[in-house]
């Protein structure tokens, strides 16, 4: 991948140097929202906000698997039962 455009289409990161992608939950207007964020060039950046946590995780995983690390294996820690 050569660039990421933020959800609101205000910013495009060309060839970003990404160290971390993650999801955090945040209450906005009394509603729980899930933000997909990235550490790009050592700065925290909001990429998008979603009302469903599973959608946020799916977006984050799509960015990792399809765009940045291609064939690199990623281990996901199992859910607590």
Task: State where each predicted segment sits.
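Eukaryotic intrinsically disordered, low-complexity regulatory linkers and tails enriched in Ser/Thr/Pro
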Residues: 1-81
């Amino acid at each position: 991948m050569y660039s990421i455009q933020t959800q609101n289409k205000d910013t495009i990161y060309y060839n970003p140097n990404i160290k971390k992608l993650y999801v955090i939950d945040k209450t906005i207007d009394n509603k729980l929202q899930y933000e997909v964020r990235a550490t790009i060039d050592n700065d925290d950046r909001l990429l998008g906000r979603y009302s469903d946590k599973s959608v946020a995780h799916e977006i984050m995983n799509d960015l990792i698997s399809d765009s940045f690390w291609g064939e690199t294996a990623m281990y996901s820690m199992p859910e607590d039962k």
